[in-house]
C-alpha cells in the first residue's frame, strides 16, 4: 500500500514540475506554430486588401475550417504568381464560392421505421 501511495505522489509531483517548467518539446512546437502563423498573416496582408481581410476574419469566427481552406488557396496562388495585385472583397467572395462548391456536402435523410407490436386492445379509449 505504501508503494502505491509513493508512486501516486511521484506521478503528481512529476506532473506539477512539467506543468510549472513546461516541456521543452512543446515550447519548440509552439514557437514553430507561431512563426508559421506570422508568415501566413504576412502573406495574406500582402495579398488581400483591407475589406477582404475584414471579411476573412469575420468568416474565421464562424467557419474556421473554410477560412483555413481559403487561406491555403490564396497562399498557394500567391506562391505560384497567379495573383495580379491585391484581392478585393468581391474577388474573395468568388474564391469563397469556389471553395464552397468544392467542399459541398450532400446530406441524405434515411428514415428507419421500427415495427412495433401495437395492439389497440391495450389502449383505453376515453
UniProtKB/Swiss-Prot annotation:
UniProt modified residues of type N-acetylalanine: 2
The keyword Phosphoprotein appears for this protein: yes
Top-level taxonomic group: Eukaryota
A GO molecular-function descriptor: DNA binding
Modified residues (N6-acetyllysine): 63
Pfam families from the UniProt entry: dsDNA_bind
Gene Ontology cellular-component terms listed: cytoplasm; nucleus
Gene Ontology biological process: apoptotic process
Region (Disordered): 17-36
InterPro entries cross-referenced by the UniProt entry: PDCD5-like, PDCD5-like_sf
Modified residues (Phosphoserine): 51, 119
Keywords (A to Z) from UniProt: Acetylation, Apoptosis, Phosphoprotein
Expression across tissues: Widely expressed.
Function according to Swiss-Prot or TrEMBL: May function in the process of apoptosis.
Family note: Belongs to the PDCD5 family.
Protein name: Programmed cell death protein 5
Source species: Mus musculus (Mouse)
Amino acid at each position: 500500500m505504501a508503494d502505491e501511495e509513493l508512486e501516486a505522489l511521484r506521478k503528481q509531483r512529476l506532473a506539477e514540475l512539467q506543468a510549472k517548467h513546461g516541456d521543452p518539446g512543446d515550447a519548440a512546437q509552439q514557437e514553430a506554430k507561431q512563426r508559421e502563423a506570422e508568415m501566413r498573416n504576412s502573406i495574406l496582408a500582402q495579398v488581400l486588401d483591407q475589406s477582404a481581410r475584414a471579411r476573412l476574419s469575420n468568416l474565421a469566427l464562424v467557419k474556421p475550417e473554410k477560412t483555413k481552406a481559403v487561406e491555403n488557396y490564396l497562399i498557394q496562388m500567391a506562391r505560384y504568381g497567379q495573383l495580379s495585385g491585391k484581392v478585393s472583397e468581391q474577388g474573395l467572395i468568388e474564391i469563397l464560392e469556389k471553395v464552397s462548391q468544392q467542399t459541398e456536402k450532400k446530406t441524405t435523410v434515411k428514415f428507419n421505421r421500427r415495427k412495433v407490436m401495437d395492439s389497440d386492445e391495450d389502449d383505453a379509449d376515453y
